[in-house]
């Protein structure tokens, strides 16, 4: 496995552990379809959480949150809908959370969580939030 892939997997492991400490139930990891991949699918109460995890060794090339823009959020929305269709589930509330992990390998990794960057109900339009 490439170093980049190992770092990404490590970041996802840390993110999953973090989400579990918040009481979320991890339903699936690394779900793929023709549209792309969801890093983590979780349940937070009655909300289905589509979690995007971005991991970096440093901030030299920007904060991990900067790698998740409107196009990526729209794709995650579509992926969440595809995941539900694949399982014949109707989740009234879905949201996208973004988790940033910075781990330079020399100390404690830093995990940051943006909850509800985008969310939608089955009967309402998508609500986009800006974290900038």
UniProtKB/Swiss-Prot annotation:
Name this protein carries in UniProt: UPF0102 protein Achl_2213
Species whose genome carries this gene: Pseudarthrobacter chlorophenolicus (strain ATCC 700700 / DSM 12829 / CIP 107037 / JCM 12360 / KCTC 9906 / NCIMB 13794 / A6)
MF terms in GO: nucleic acid binding
Cystine pairings recorded for this chain: none
Family under the similarity heading: Belongs to the UPF0102 family.
CDD domains: PoNe_Nuclease (cd20736)
């Amino acid at each position: 496995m490439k170093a980049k892939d190992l770092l990404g997997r490590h970041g996802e492991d840390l993110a999953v552990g973090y989400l579990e400490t918040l009481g979320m139930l991890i339903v699936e990891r690394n779900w793929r379809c023709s549209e792309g991949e969801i890093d983590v699918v979780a349940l937070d109460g009655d909300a289905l959480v589509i979690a995007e995890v971005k991991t970096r060794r440093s901030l030299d090339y920007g904060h991990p949150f900067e790698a998740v823009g409107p196009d990526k959020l729209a794709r995650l929305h579509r992926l969440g809908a595809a995941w539900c269709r694949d399982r014949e589930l109707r989740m009234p509330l879905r949201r996208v959370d973004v988790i940033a992990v910075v781990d330079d390998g020399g100390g404690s990794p830093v995990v940051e969580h943006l909850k509800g960057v985008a969310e939608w109900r089955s009967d309402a339009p998508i609500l986009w939030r800006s974290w900038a």
